[in-house]
C-alpha cells in the first residue's frame, strides 16, 4: 500500500517478489513453512484463518532460535546478521540481533508476535481468535502434520513430535525457545 503511488517503489517491490520467487524455486523451505501450512486453516472454525505470510513472519524468529542449536545453521544466521550490519561480538549475540530485527520488522508491519494475539485480518489483538483451549486441543495433530509436511525434510534441525509441539506452543504464547 505504501508503494501504490510510487512508481519506483512499485518497481522495487516487483523486483523483490521476482527475486524471492527465484530463490524459493532454487532452495528448499524448512519448518517455518511447515508450521505455517498446518496452522493456516486449522482454526477456521474459530472465526478465521492465519494468513500464510503472517504465520511465516510470526514463526521465523522462533524457528531461527530453534535451528541455531545446529552449528551450521547458527553460522549462517550469524553471517546474515553480519551482512545486515546488526552488530554483535559473538555468534549468539548476532543471532539474537537478527531475531530482534525480525521482531521489530513484524512490529513495523503490524504483524502479531504470536498466535494468541492474532486477531481479525491478521492484526495484533489483546485476545486473538484462537482460544487457548482450541489451540491445545489441536496441538498434537498440527505438530504431527507439520512434521510430515514436505518442507520439514530440508530444515537444518529435524524436530521430534515433542519439539514441534513445544515450538508451536512458543509460537502461541510468544515464549522463549530454549530447547
Q: What function would you assign to each model-found segment?
A:
Residues 9-12, 31, 35, 55-59, ...:
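Residue-level detector of well-ordered alpha-helical segments, enriched
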Residues 10, 92-95, 136, 161:
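Short, structured helix-loop boundary elements
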Residues 13-21, 35, 60, 102, ...:
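Short alpha-helical scaffolding segments that buttress acidic/His motifs in well-ordered protein cores
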Residues 42-134, 177:
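Gly/Pro-rich interdomain helix-loop hinge
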Residues 133-179:
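Short, amphipathic C-terminal "tail helix"
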Residues 18-56, 149-154:
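Glycine-rich phosphate/pyrophosphate-binding beta-alpha loops
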Residues 1-27, 124-126, 162:
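Carboxylate- and glycine-rich phosphate/diphosphate-binding segment that chelates Mg2+/Mn2+
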